[in-house]
Regions:
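A glycine/threonine-rich phosphate-anchoring loop and its flanking beta-alpha core
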Residues: 9, 112-204
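ATP/NTP phosphate-donor binding region
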Residues: 1-96
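Glycine-rich beta-strand-to-loop/alpha-helix junction loops that act as flexible
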Residues: 70-71, 101-103, 245-246
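C-terminal charged capping/lid subdomain of soluble metabolic enzymes
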Residues: 2-4, 290-356
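Active-site segments that bind and position negatively charged phosphate/pyrophosphate groups
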Residues: 206-309
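Short glycine/serine/threonine-rich phosphate/pyrophosphate-binding segments
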Residues: 105-112, 133, 252
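Catalytic-loop motifs flanking and including active-site residues across diverse enzymes
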Residues: 79, 177, 267-270
Length: 356
């Protein structure tokens, strides 16, 4: 078991990584006893874990559930309103809890609801995907998509506890597990290397991904990197933006794919696209690109922009990116592994820099 506390602004988040902890929630967070709890989950996760969770908590708490359709399209204002209605009808107060059981979509949606209902409910994250377990469940960002713009409406609201059970990852399809690992690989690329990081990267193979011990180490390392960056830059003005490496192109490709690509697959494409341009401009060692491409390809992750998307379509999508401004767009670039930096380019300069 690994435990630590993350202090962000005026809030403290307890982070716990422990195999099997999802079956011992009251041990991990006894404050749930005697409170009303709304469990928010999606249609994919609910059949796997919802009943087990309700049975644990119903003996000592009033438990309510809200299931939304699986997928990014559920991260919308209509579902925020549905959750509000549940909370109002069941007379929730600020002393009660919203528990997010799911991946990044559920975590983002639920955290936004918790942050805005009565100006703040207690929030617990129980992430079930590798992206959520290693990254999105901590740091306090909440969001929904609006008018086809990703994460346009949101707040900063750290959870009181993030309870990570790597065992939950074993039910993920291989494709989804690999896509999630793209985010862990990204974190290892932008972080100052620790002695164990190269060993971790070497162990990321399809055959090893069924082992909870390795999954626990990977999500723990991802959370440690995210914790360090969020602590020095909670409101996302500088260092925390390093976590967006690969996301500029990635978000555009993901939006154009309209659900045909997982988020991590789009990030994989985005990272390689940026690294190829950096190598072409002699701003990144070729060996870093080669190692990254080989690792991503070994997991069957895409590294090429789908042929049906034109460069102009991608550039048009970039104009609605949150990192865009009147000058252009802020990019996350790499000098080398563990040496990220920010640079703003005009859209014209960026297109030329990419060789498009």
């Amino acid at each position: 078991m690994t435990n630590w506390q993350l202090k962000l602004a005026d809030k403290t988040t307890k982070i716990q990584v422990q195999t099997g902890s999802s079956q011992q929630l009251l041990t991990a967070w006894p404050q749930l006893e005697g409170r009303k709890i709304l469990i928010l989950t999606d249609s994919q996760v609910a059949p796997l874990y919802l009943q087990r969770l309700v049975q644990q908590l119903a003996a000592v708490s009033q438990v309510f559930t809200q299931i939304v359709a699986a997928g990014e399209s559920s991260k919308k204002l209509a579902n925020v309103e549905i959750c509000y209605q549940q909370l109002i009808e069941n007379h929730f107060t600020r002393q009660d809890y919203l528990l997010c059981l799911g991946g990044g979509m559920v975590g983002d949606l639920g955290a936004l609801v918790a942050s805005t209902f009565m100006r703040g409910l207690h929030l617990i994250q129980l992430p079930t995907t590798i992206v959520a377990q290693s990254d999105s469940s901590i740091g306090g960002k909440t969001a929904i998509d609006y008018h086809d713009v990703k994460n346009l409406i949101g707040t900063f609201y750290p959870a009181e506890a993030v309870l990570v059970d790597p065992e939950l990852l074993l039910t993920l399809p291989q494709r989804e597990l690999a896509a999630g690992l793209a985010e862990v690989i990204k974190s290892l690329l932008i972080s100052e290397q620790q002695p164990e990081d190269q060993q971790l990267l070497a162990q990321i193979t399809p055959d090893e991904l069924t082992k909870t011990a390795l999954l626990a180490r990977l999500v723990t390392r991802g959370l440690q990197i995210k914790s360090q960056l969020a602590q020095v830059d909670f409101y996302d003005f500088k260092e925390r933006r390093y976590l967006n490496f690969g996301h500029t192109i990635g978000h555009a490709v993901e939006a154009l794919a309209a659900g045909q690509l997982h988020h991590g697959e789009a990030v994989s494409i985005g990272m390689v696209t940026m690294m190829r341009a950096l190598v072409a401009h002699q701003q990144l060692p070729t060996s870093v690109l080669t190692q990254t491409q080989q690792l991503l390809s070994s997991l069957n992750l895409p590294i090429e922009i789908p042929q049906q998307f034109t460069h102009q379509q991608i550039m048009t999508k970039l104009m609605t990116d949150k990192k865009a401004n009147d000058v252009g767009i802020q990019l996350v670039l790499l000098h080398d592994i563990g040496q990220p930096y920010l640079q703003t380019m005009t859209f014209t300069d960026f297109k030329q820099w990419l060789g498009w």
